[in-house]
């Protein structure tokens, strides 16, 4: 596990000398695995901290997760920041599901803590946010995006590196993570909402993917990941093409305005027109 994750991090240049890493620690198996693995890889390549977000839902179960995170970090000598959010109120105020509201608030906390820590580091050092998504999550995400009608960017799946966010466990699967924890006699918390059929992702995980494996192709998950990788390459190429076309064709640029000739835009294939528009909006 350690070598696999270390090699994957190096392949995708997730950290550089002098960088620091914040682990998003929920207390579940995936984030516990991520923290324990990175703890063993941390010195001297990067400094390590953890952040646990209490979402203000799940009552005693959430309190249990917080206490577990504190105990785990104490045992590993990893500094821990606990942040408290009231997800139901935020969800109601912004017309969001609690799942989406929790995700937004969680990332806000992580980005804030990363920014604060970065100010304490030497110039040029960055703070990365390590998230515990793994191979199974990626396959589920690709399938979910397909069923929602996503474009190539969504169908490419979860990116290993996205700004300061890194995902060192995308090279391993759920079963590998559980096996690693059990072999090391490392405990974790179970989130009861992960079993709820109310969430689409849970239904994909517990019903749709198993059905595809048994009724269509036992290698369905692997093939979904392979397709996502190919689509990701196509997406990256189209982004690059849009950037090159833009740089060649742009004819006017002001502080809040840039333009390319309509003729240059019109002669592009439809898919590149879409990518050009996205590039302009970015």
Which role fits each region the language model picked out?
Residues 1-210:
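Core alpha/beta nucleotide-donor-binding catalytic domains of modification enzymes
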Residues 17, 253-282:
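Mid-to-C-terminal catalytic/tRNA-binding core of tRNA(Ile)-lysidine synthase
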Residues 32-35, 225, 274, 278:
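Short amphipathic alpha-helical segments
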Residues 138, 223, 241, 272-276:
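Residue-level detector of well-ordered alpha-helical segments, enriched
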Residues 147, 213, 281-282:
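Hydrophobic/aromatic-lined pockets within catalytic cores
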Residues 149, 214-218, 271:
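Residues at alpha-helix boundaries and the short loops/turns that link adjacent helices
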Residues 166-257, 264:
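Contiguous mid-protein beta-loop-alpha structural module that forms a pocket-lining wall or clamp
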């Amino acid at each position: 596990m350690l070598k696999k994750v270390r090699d994957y991090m190096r392949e995708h240049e997730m950290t550089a000398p002098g960088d620091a890493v914040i682990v998003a620690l929920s207390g579940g198996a995936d984030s516990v695995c991520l923290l324990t693995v990175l703890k063993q890889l941390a010195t001297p390549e990067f400094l390590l901290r953890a952040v646990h977000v209490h979402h203000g839902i799940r009552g005693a179960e959430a309190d249990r997760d917080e206490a577990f995170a504190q105990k785990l970090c104490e045992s590993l000598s990893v500094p821990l920041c606990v942040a408290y959010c009231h997800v139901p109120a935020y969800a109601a105020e912004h017309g969001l599901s609690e799942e989406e509201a929790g995700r937004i608030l969680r990332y806000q906390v992580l980005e804030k803590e990363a920014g604060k820590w970065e100010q304490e580091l030497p110039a040029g050092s960055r703070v990365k946010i390590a998230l515990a998504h793994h191979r199974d999550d990626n396959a589920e995400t690709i399938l979910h995006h397909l069923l929602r009608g996503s474009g190539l960017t969504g169908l490419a799946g979860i990116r290993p590196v996205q700004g300061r966010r890194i995902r060192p466990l995308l090279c391993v699967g759920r079963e590998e993570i559980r096996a690693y924890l059990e072999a090391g006699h490392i405990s974790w918390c179970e989130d009861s909402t992960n079993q709820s059929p109310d969430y689409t992702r849970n239904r994909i995980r517990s019903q749709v993917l198993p059905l595809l494996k048994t009724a269509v192709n036992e290698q369905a998950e692997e093939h979904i990941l392979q397709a996502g990788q190919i689509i990701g390459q196509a997406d990256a190429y189209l982004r690059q093409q849009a950037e090159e076309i833009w740089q060649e064709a742009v004819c006017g640029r002001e502080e809040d305005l840039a333009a390319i000739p309509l003729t240059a835009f019109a002669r592009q294939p439809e898919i590149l027109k879409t990518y050009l528009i996205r590039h302009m909006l970015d």
